[in-house]
A protein has these predicted regions:
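Auxiliary alpha/beta "docking" domains used to position bulky ligands
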Residues: 1-146
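Iron-sulfur cluster-binding cysteine motifs and their immediate structural context
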Residues: 152-162
Length: 162
């Protein structure tokens, strides 16, 4: 993915994405489905996130726009910017730091309840008003890495629970 090299500065410094950024809201939208595709070895396997009829970017962006509109209604000085794995953002890093899951050895973010069947997105926001700048947010802590010495997702990815 050559394009990821382009904006290394923005990936490591969120204030280059949105000036005066104060918070990053990391979100996960589940895509796990009870529908099971046929286990025919002659057919290609398609990842679950691609089973839908619509582009997940459009679905999630619509939801994020609604959330950002609500946040921005709180004050005319609040600004937001969001991405759905399509911007200069380290989605997995923000997800882990926000407590959505831990980084598995297979490089997927894994949540103890939902596995890795979710899309990641981020909302960056800042408050121009001094009243809001001084508000301290309660942040979720990163969660424990449950992988420990397990390597099943690397050895037999089809059998691991992710």
């Amino acid at each position: 993915m050559k394009w990821m090299e382009k904006y290394i500065d923005k990936r490591t410094n969120p204030s280059l994405i949105l000036e005066n950024v104060k918070s990053v809201i990391s979100l996960a939208l589940l895509y796990d489905t009870p529908v099971i595709h046929r286990e025919d070895e002659n057919l290609p396997k398609i990842s679950r996130y691609a089973w839908g009829e619509r582009d997940y970017h459009k679905i999630i962006k619509s939801k994020l726009k609604q959330i950002c509109n609500e946040i921005e209604l709180l004050s005319p000085n609040i600004k937001t910017k969001f991405y759905v794995d399509d911007g200069p953002v380290m989605d997995k890093v923000w997800a882990v730091r926000s407590g959505l899951g831990w980084m598995g050895k297979n490089t997927n973010v894994i949540n103890p309840e939902y596995g890795s069947y979710f899309f990641l997105s981020e909302i960056f926001n800042f408050f121009l008003s001094e009243i809001f700048i001084n508000i301290e947010f309660e942040y979720d802590e990163p969660i424990e890495d449950y992988c420990k010495n397990c390597r099943l997702c690397l050895i037999e990815p089809d059998r691991s629970v992710i």
